[in-house]
Structures are given as structure tokens and as C-alpha cells.
């Protein structure tokens, strides 16, 4: 039995897709990386804005708002890039080939 989050996948399905467990682990890692990016990005932005606030006073709710937006944007970027890597991994595990739009030539 392969676990995907809280649900279990049938053995027959797992046998047809041997890379399912690796893909699930990759997706989980990507989402946790996104959560970590949101927390650290929001905290770092808030700290920076509190430092700037000493020179240019403004209401603190703007610091919260800008920090949350910056953390969300950074988290979205990181999560989408990591999920794309997981999709490429899934295609490779299923077909044995890399997607056509990815070049493996280091000189490109």
C-alpha cells in the first residue's frame, strides 16, 4: 500500500505506477518548502519593514500587509517551481524520458 497524504492507494494502481511514492514524496517536499518560504519570507520582510519604520514612520498594519503579500508571492514562486520539478520527475518515472522542453545540454 502506498500512502498519498491521508489516503491509501490500491496495490494494483501502485503496481501500474512504480514512481508514485517518489512523486508523492516530491510533492510533499515542495509544499513544505513553500510553507517554510512563506513563514521565513513574511518574517524577514516584517523585520526589514520594522527597521525601515524607524526612519519613515507609518502605520504598522502596512507592515503586516506588505509582509504577508511578499511572503505569499515568494511562497507561490518557490512552490510552483518545485511542483514543476515534481511533474518532470513523474514524467521521467512513467516514460523514462525527460520532457521535451528541458535541455540536458550544459552549454545552452
Curated annotation (Swiss-Prot):
Transmembrane domains' residue ranges: 30-52, 59-78
Entry keyword annotation includes Membrane: yes
Annotated compartments: Membrane
Membrane topology: Multi-pass membrane protein
Superkingdom in the source lineage: Eukaryota
Keywords on record: Membrane, Transmembrane, Transmembrane helix
Any Pfam family hit: TMEM141
Record InterPro entries: Tmem141, Tmem141_sf
Any one of the GO CC terms: membrane
Family as reported in the entry's similarity comment: Belongs to the TMEM141 family.
Name of the protein in question: Transmembrane protein 141
Biological source species: Mus musculus
Gene assigned in the entry: Tmem141
